[in-house]
Amino acid sequence: MERDLYGDMADQPIPVGQGVQIRFINDLKENGKPRGKRSKQDSYGVAVRVQGIDGQPFVVLNSGDKAKSSYDYDRHYSERSSTLDTAYSQSSRESAWSRGSQKKTDNGEYPSLGYRSATSQQSTSASNKTNKNGLSTSSFSNQSSEDIDTKPLSSVDSLITKFDVKGQVRGRTARRSQALKDERKRSQSLDGRKNYQDTADSREISLQQQNEVPARRETVSSANRSFARQSLEREDINKTRLTKEWLDQGGEEPVIVKQQRSVQSEFQLKSTPDLLRDQQADGSDPTREMIFSILRDGSTENENNLRKKTSILLEKFPSLQAQPGEDTRSLGSQKKELERKVAELQRQLDDEMKQRMKLESSQGRPKAGMQRLEIQLEESKEECSRLKDLYDKKKNELNAVSQELMEVRMGKEQVETKLRAMEDKLMDSKEELSHLRAKGGTSPDKLALMKELEEVQDELDEVLQIRQKQEELLRQKDRELTALKGALKDEVANHDKDLDRVREQYQNDVQQLRKNMENVSQDQLSLETERQKINQVVRNLQRELEESSDEINQWKEMFQKNKEELRSTKQELLQMKMEKEESEDELKETKDRFSLLQSELEQAKKGSVDPGELASVRKELQRVQDQLKQLSVDKQKVEENLHQRERELSALKGALKEEVAGRGRETERLREQLQSEVVQFKKDNENLGRESQRIQDQLKQVLLEKQRHEEAVHQRERELSALKGALKDEVSGRDREAERLRAQFEQDAMQTKRSYEELVKINKRLESEKVDLERVRQVIENNLQESREENDDLRRKILGLEAQLKETNTFCDDLQRAESRLKDKITKLETERKRMEDTLGEAADQEQELAFVKRDLGNKLEEAQRSLKRLSLEYEELQECYQEEMKQKDHLKKTKNELEEQKRLLDKSMDKLTRELDNMSNESRGSLQVLQSQLEEFREKSRREIGEAQKQAKEKTAEAERHQFNSSRMQEEVQKLKLALQELQVEKETVELDKQMVTQRLQNLEQDTESKKRVQDDRSRQVKVLEDKLKRMEAELDEEKNTVELLSDRINRSREQMEQQRAELMQERARGQDLECDKISLERQNKDLKGRLANMEGQQKPSVNVSHLEAKLQDIQERLQSEEREKATLLSTNRKLERKLKELNIQLEDERLHVNDQKDQLNLRVKALKRQVDEAEEEIERLEGLRKKAVREMEEQQELNEQLQTRLKTMEKESKRKPIRPAHNDDDDLSSDGEYGGSYDPSSITSLLTESNLQTSSC
């Protein structure tokens, strides 16, 4: 409703009204009698008519108590002054009702929160009310952010042409018409009235007097008040910890409570008792009745004419017929929506705190990424609170400036009331003169009185002319002020919309950040579970490796046992061989004997046969046959033992085969499991990389959103500074109009300037914090880059492990092939065994072939020995392969430990970074708290000074009123002298205030220089810290270079060792070839000897050389065995050397890879160090530029200080030299021309203000 009354009425093209009419009811007199004492201190009633922008009258109803209200109504320009006066008196009666309704809300709101008392609102006027209403209504509009005008403010003339198109002249063009006596009596009847007291009795009396007020509206207003009280109680219950801290820190109302209070005040203003009084029970238009009652009071016209005039006014202004129900419903819905939003935000905050508590309880030590995000969230919250504080401060300063403007306007109105009182006195004197003329008579006293009256009339004409000029100036100033107020209103509305939009956007960003934090926490938990799974798998693999090592040890023990058994069987075989040789010798001896016996028998047959000898020969033959039988039995036993040993050997071979097959299956299973774990590890690593990239993108988005917020805040601050500039111009104009309040305004201007400088400092600090955040972000990005490089190193190591796995697979294949070869050899041995069995069967049947069987057995034994040697060698190779596998497992364990060590180092570095970030945030918080405390102290001090100045101003106004009341009874000469004295005192006070202002400015400049010195010292300390960091980095770089040199020395030494091993290997190979040649020659000799032996045995002729040859053959066999043993030892040593060479090659390759990795890491670290050095150099250059800039600013401030000091000295000299003006120039103490002759003309004031603006801009 108020928007329609204020906005739509301003759009109608109505003729511009004339003048400003103000009447203090308590100052009116009746028949020249002095007014009586006031019934109560500071109690008065005032009716003010101020002409609006487009001719719209604006009425302020004010009283001395704590309430205030304002209404708009339309009037014709052609109404005469008597109607205006009566309308004002009627409106003053209506103000009592508005005070009664308003006081209830002012005293009922927030009784225990310690907010500002309502006494500071006594001097506010209608323009402030309209501005506040405009702000409250425009804050709920849905305009977009593109409608904001970011261009600089236009000039005052363009604003006047924008808001005031019509060019008619305001003010009175003629003298004020004489007021009727009954109207003055009516005004005098209001003087003795007491102030309206908001008690139950007064409300009952007022309600009895106003019978037209329907009961329905009272129930609605009481319901609204109860609803507002309940909502406030709910809000007080739902307040959070932050809100309580805000309430404990200061008396400022929160923004939401202010909005609710403005909504409640608007809702209550729409149902004030004076409007309810004029509403009829039959549902007639209250606006029509109000306009009719205004026109009817003090008018002598007919009622029908007045009705026609009201209808014409309503036709011209259709916006007055707005329905209040929709507005109140919309305000109620908006209030409910605000309450719902506050409850929802409170609920979200509680949920977030619960989630954070759960996360902290579940997670013992938060990770570095989570800590960074929490730190950024806390910094964004602190930045939001700082922005809110700045917004509240600016809003409070704007309200204070508007209140001070209203106080200036009230002072102007008081001056105008004094002028009207003088006019009333003149009218009374004219009436007395007319009465005297009517009576007749020309006495000399009457002639003297006539002359005095004519002189007084001439003086009054001069005063009126001066007053008309002053009104013309004031009219122009009012038009400028209204234009500026319109522009200010639009700017403030747009600013509030932008702030609401920024607040909503910030809330959305905070919610998005919370969601991102929850997602990060969930991802972190999932990563933790995956890491636990991987650790479990690694532990299982370690356990399996330990079990496999235990099994390998058991197999080694079994193999050792089998080896010992084989050695024992070999010894037994050798013994059996020796026994067989003995038996063969015996058999030879028996054969020799048998041949001798045969020869003897033949000789005996040839000769004479002796029966004794024949019996002895037969006995000898029987004995030889028995020996042969015994030898055959022994041979069977030996054969049985051989069969048993072969069976044991085949069983051992089968067990060994099964063992090798089991080990192959186990290695295959381990290989598959390791491959699956490697694939899973790769997947987890890729997920970690993607997660880190996503977190980095989220951090970039948060930083971009923060930059946008900071840009919006800077834009709002620029707009506020522009608005402050307009307000300063307005304040300087009002200071020229009201000289008495200039000091207070200048102090307020200085305070706003200091607050602006503090805001600029805070802004710089915010920029520095932004730079620090950028630096921290770069550090985080570098750490992420390092983590990616480490992930690449891990991938390379995993590839190396896969290559090692492939080598183990190939080794397993080689083992399987060796196993197949062993199987073939075993089959060959079995076939040979069968063949040996056949030959042994034939030897049992034919004793003649014992020699051939003996040779075959010898050959087979030799082959068995060679096979046993080969088996033992293959077993040793297998054992060496197992040892190599164990070494590879140890190497894998070492690489795993190195990876864990690197991970621990990474965790330590991340913890160190988080601690540094915490320290930086704590330092920034501490500095911010110190600045806030200093700012609060400065504000308290300025408030106390303003309160003292206001008290002094009130005391001075009271003294001025007393002097004025006494001066009305004194003569004109005394009054002129007193006025001259007052002007001198005012000028002296202005000079003193100017001096104080200059001293304060000097103090501020000194403080600025000290702060800049401190900043310079801090920057020098930062430069020193950066230099120390550079030195530290250079030392680390030297250490890394030394480590690289040591690694290169180790590589050279290992290469030399490899060359030595190769030379030894070549020597061993040459020796092996020589031994092979010797072996081949010995085998040839052996074959020759065996052939010769076979020929000798085939001849069946005993010879003396047989034994010699057999001994020689045995020696040759022993030499051959010893050479074979030496050859076996040489082969084993050769294999060992080859294995060592392979190991050295592998070790060299690993060291080369390790050196390359370290070289890459060192290159990356060198690049990072160079980048840090470049950043440090850039930071040093930037600090040097800032230092130079600060020095230049300090020099400029010193120059300004010197200029101000010279200006102050010249002003003091001019104030001392200035003489007292003559009395005839000081007739009118309220003329605005008197202040142009002083030491402060408008040009000097504007120059000072421009200098202050220049100073703030340079800061």
Curated annotation (Swiss-Prot):
Stretches the record annotates as Disordered: 69-151, 169-232, 317-338, 941-969, 1192-1259
Annotated signal peptide: none
Family: Belongs to the cingulin family.
A cellular-component GO term for this protein: myosin complex
Known function: Probably plays a role in the formation and regulation of the tight junction (TJ) paracellular permeability barrier, possibly by linking ZO proteins to the actomyosin cytoskeleton.
Source organism phylogeny: Eukaryota, Metazoa, Chordata, Craniata, Vertebrata
Record's compositionally biased regions (Low complexity): 117-127
Xref: InterPro entries: Myosin_tail (IPR002928)
Coiled-coil ranges (or none): 325-1218
Protein name per the record: Cingulin
Species whose genome carries this gene: Xenopus tropicalis (Western clawed frog)
Residue span of region Head: 9-324
Stretches the record annotates as Tail: 1220-1259
Pfam families attached to this UniProt entry: Myosin_tail_1
Localization, UniProt: Cell junction, Tight junction
Comp. bias regions, Polar residues: 80-100, 128-145, 220-229, 1241-1259
Main location: other
